[in-house]
């Protein structure tokens, strides 16, 4: 049977009225195209109208030379561009990178991969160099008792004697917190139990948590107008977290010890 099929194909090339399929007709079409046909042998060994469109694979009416005349070619893309800057300054937004198509897919070849990627982004300064963006950074806090163990001498050589002591205190009113805070009972994490909704707490900003350039601590909420909900997270248990609102900035903290914390 195979010999007969090969013989018929050979005879079709000698028949004056016969075309050899897609190659001789010069046809290769994407998708389903009823006008993309030729005269010749089909893959199902029937002579007559055969097709050279991509859908012929599913309908079974391709010309016998479709695979050779119309090989599948995958999509090729170029390299990623560099990441763009943040779409906006001083607030959470996105950055983007793109790549272009070097060769479109043909004849059922692999489709193109994503041509654009986005990622979260937050810039901490304006184009003019003004410090910003701290409102959206969670405040990482721990008990003020940790300050007794932490040296006040910053490691950066840029710190002067004047800036070593240039700290400040932020007062916040707690709005919400997760139940995980109350579950802590280890000696070094028991301080989390004293975080309560509705209480005013003090958080001290001191070196080395204080940035040596901006002289601020991340997440201090200093730019907030007092109505904005800010986020905090306890160091030692990432599931102990919550929200608060800024009350004011003061030079020295004056809250009870159990409601006194420090920025990390």
Swiss-Prot record:
Cited Pfam families: SBSPON_C, TSP1_spondin
Glycosylation sites: 227
Keywords for this protein: Disulfide bond, Extracellular matrix, Glycoprotein, Secreted, Signal
Tissues expressing the protein: Detected in aorta extracellular matrix (at protein level).
TSP type-1 domain segment(s): 74-127
First and last residue of the signal peptide: 1-20
Domain of life: Eukaryota
Main location class: secreted
SMART domains in alphabetical order: TSP1
GO CC annotations, alphabetized: collagen-containing extracellular matrix; extracellular region
Disulfide bonds: 28-36, 28-52, 36-70, 50-52, 50-63, 56-62, 63-70
Claim: DNA repair is one of the keywords in the record: no
SMB domain mapped to chain residues: 24-75
Location in or out of the cell: Secreted, Extracellular space, Extracellular matrix
Family, per entry: Belongs to the thrombospondin family.
Protein name as it appears in the record: Somatomedin-B and thrombospondin type-1 domain-containing protein
Species of origin: Homo sapiens
Phylogenetic placement of the source organism: Eukaryota, Metazoa, Chordata, Craniata, Vertebrata
